[in-house]
């Protein structure tokens, strides 16, 4: 379903852009596990949570994400299931709910030993399982933790998995697109003027 939505969203946007004589965009897709973790950290490399600190409550005792703080106590954080994404503050990249609310699918295949053989400069591990492959090959990495998870799963570096052919009330997805640079008219932030890039749109 995630990939079908990405195809639909790409076609819809490109159809609109084409009708307005604008350059077509790259395909929407699921992020890799590495991209997802980088985004969740928000530029704060050594902090365990997207909000920056080592705690899951702020100084006033309020929870910083939607998760299960105690056994069976789903309402302790103010949300029984999912909540509006704007219910909690974004991270330093301006992204909401990078931990808690719903865990998120990635495009990365799950393998417990992936860090033993993954290449540092291209750490994504992708396997497109066939229907008759074993269940282990149908596992995809999920990140971020959800409303039903304990605080451990909200950690930026915690990884778990779910089977790619299943749908769960506690797993969602986030679209990403590869950024290739500027195209067309851009705003010169330094001078506040509109500039034209080297690529001319026909």
Labelled PLM ranges:
Residues 201-202:
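Short, solvent-exposed mixed-charge patches
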Residues 1-156, 184-186, 190-198:
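Functional-site microenvironments in short loops/helix caps that host divalent-cation chemistry
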Residues 169-185:
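Short, structured beta-strand segments at or near domain termini in extracellular proteins/domains
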């Amino acid at each position: 379903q995630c990939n079908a939505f990405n195809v639909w969203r790409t076609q819809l946007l490109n159809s609109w852009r084409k009708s307005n004589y604008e350059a077509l965009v790259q395909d929407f897709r699921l992020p890799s596990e590495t991209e997802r973790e980088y985004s969740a950290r928000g530029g704060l490399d050594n902090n365990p949570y997207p909000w920056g600190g080592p705690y899951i409550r702020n100084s006033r005792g309020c929870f910083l994400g939607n998760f299960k703080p105690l056994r069976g106590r789903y309402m302790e954080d103010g949300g029984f299931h999912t909540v509006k994404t704007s219910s909690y503050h974004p991270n330093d990249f301006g992204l909401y709910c990078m931990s808690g609310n719903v865990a998120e699918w990635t495009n990365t295949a799950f393998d417990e030993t992936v860090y033993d053989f993954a290449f540092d400069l291209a750490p994504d591990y992708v396997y497109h399982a066939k229907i008759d492959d074993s269940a282990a090959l149908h596992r995809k990495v999920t990140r971020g933790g959800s409303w039903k998870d304990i605080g451990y799963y909200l950690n930026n570096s915690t990884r778990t998995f779910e089977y790619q052919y299943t749908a769960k009330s506690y797993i969602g997805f986030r679209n990403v697109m590869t950024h290739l640079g500027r195209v067309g008219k851009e705003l010169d932030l330094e001078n506040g003027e509109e500039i034209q890039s080297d690529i001319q749109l026909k």
